[in-house]
Amino acid sequence: MKRGLLPIALAAALAGGAMGAGRDAVETRICASLEEASRGSPGPVLLVFFSTDCPICYDDLFESRYLVDKGRWPVSVVGVFSGPRDDLKAFLEKYAWTLPVVLDRRKVLFKKYKVDAVPFKALLLGTEAVYRDDPYVGPDGRREELKRCLTQLFYR
């Protein structure tokens, strides 16, 4: 190979690898189970059940991540979605969501944590839910209640 072509070939190979990694990045965020999604995070997990066609769910998902980041609590935020994989993939790409999402097509987590409607949040310590959204309380009240629960959990 000529000297001038070597850097071009190397750049093309690296670009191809980077492009391939970018395509697969969405796939790695879509998990088949809660265990897969929370792997490597020994602390509590905040499950955020959502739908891609629900603007309130979108707000709840991103506000949950913001709340955990702002409070600097060692909590993993994991989305839970039961709709079509293509809808989830498009959502993740459109909004650049980088945290894991469990694709729960059989609604195993929905049933386990008794989720009837979205948006809904549950804070898990191990497998026990120490916080569950109250569907009869508005979004602001639920946010404050979650914040109070996290504060009690970490600042005893």
Where do the PLM segments sit?
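Conserved helix-turn-beta segment immediately C-terminal to the redox Cys motif
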Residues: 43, 61-80
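Thiol-/selenol-based redox modules, centered on thioredoxin-like
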Residues: 130-156
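Bacterial N-terminal signal peptides
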Residues: 7-15
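Thiol-based oxidoreductase modules, predominantly thioredoxin-like and allied folds used
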Residues: 75-87, 99-106
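Bacterial Sec-dependent signal peptides at the C-terminal "C-region" and cleavage site
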Residues: 14-24
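Conserved redox-active cysteine motifs that mediate thiol-disulfide chemistry
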Residues: 49-63
